[in-house]
Amino acid sequence: KAGLKSGDRILMLDQDTLYQKNLSSSDIVSKLKGSSAAPIRLSVYRKKADSIFTFDLTRGPVPLPSVSSSYMINDETGYVKINRFSQTTFIEFTQALESLVKQEMEHLILDLRGNPGGYLLPAKQIADDFLSDQRPIVIVESNNGIRERTVASSTGLFENGSLFVLVDENSASASEVIAGAIQDNDRGLLIGRRTFGKGLVQQQMPLGGGDQIRLTTARYYTPTGRSIQRPYDSTSRDDYYAEVQERYNTGEMQDENQIPLNDSLVFTTPKGRKVYGGGGISPDLYISNEDSPEEIWNNYFLRSSLLNNFIFLEMDLKPQKYNFDNPAEFFNEPLPYKEDFIDAFKTYCLENSFPIEINDKNQEIFLNSAKAFIAIQLFGENLHTRIVNQKDPFIQKALDTIDAL
């Protein structure tokens, strides 16, 4: 709002010099934080203009949206990404869904990958938007055996269009409530890999002195009666928390036939489909992690900060190459000077003792990833997600399924 731009280097906060003090990012953040509505003055250096600018700002709450992206993939298909379930998630989701419905959306891809959960209420409210009146959403059973059954109302925003929910091994808790409600009601298809398997309701209790303890007070069950929670009574604490990693060792991450199915915990949906309890929710359409873009070329590299750091330096030193004002223009244009970009990045990796090979097999994925990182700097996370999704096998599976309808 005040005119700060991505890439500006903060030199001073009020009268406090911040540069050349070997401060960490957390040190800088702690200095920037303070009382709400308090005025501060920042002096920044902007390389593109080769000038120092001063901004008078007012501190305020930092928004942390839980709906990180929403847009129309094509004329008929919408996409919404939810990162976590917070107090504002349902409001954010409703705004996104209403916008997509106004654009005549017929199919929706709801992305819950990597979503660890959070508040239960917004998850129930979101599921309600997809289900017709009185359809079951979730069952919560307390420690004393009392069961509370939540059912849908008659006011859902998207009760009839086709629905695809993307999940993976890091989709947990409230994410699994939505996934279970959709699958058990035959409302849509789950695409991805088996979810985490956390179906416990926990209440946080203060102990004094800033300490807290979380007490388990209830369990979640899907509408058919499946327990979401992975069993933990016959395994060690370490083994329980290592279970997701163990899926790599058993082959489950590459082969859906390795997903453990408990024949004694078989449930049936209204349309006669068999679904299994025992921990986590298995997808209807499986995606191997080998099909994920990061697995195509050096998973460790993508998780490192090399590409992000290189792009920051590249955009800082050569701003004229990335002079885009319109996100649509940037989205539709190929990465500028791609051969020079690749050569410069290879050199940068060598200088950082991390030689990398970019070849015909991985070049397309690399350039798409690089373009997505640049999009964050220029336009924010929504455009970043749109670019990443162009090469996403989960998204492609959903689109292929829609085409086959």
Predicted regions and their residues:
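Cleft-lining beta-strand/loop regions that shape enzyme active-site pockets
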Residues: 14-17, 21, 25-210, 219
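Short, flexible surface segments
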Residues: 6-7, 209, 224, 271, ...
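Short, well-ordered loop/turn sites that connect or cap secondary structure elements
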Residues: 4-5, 25, 269
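A short glycine-leucine-enriched loop at secondary-structure breakpoints
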Residues: 1-9, 33-35, 181
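Conserved functional hotspot residues or short segments at active or partner-binding sites
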Residues: 227-228, 232-405
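Residue-level recognition of conserved beta-strand edge/terminus positions
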Residues: 13-14, 45, 231, 278
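Polar, glycine-rich mid-to-C-terminal structural blocks
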Residues: 174, 186, 193, 197-265
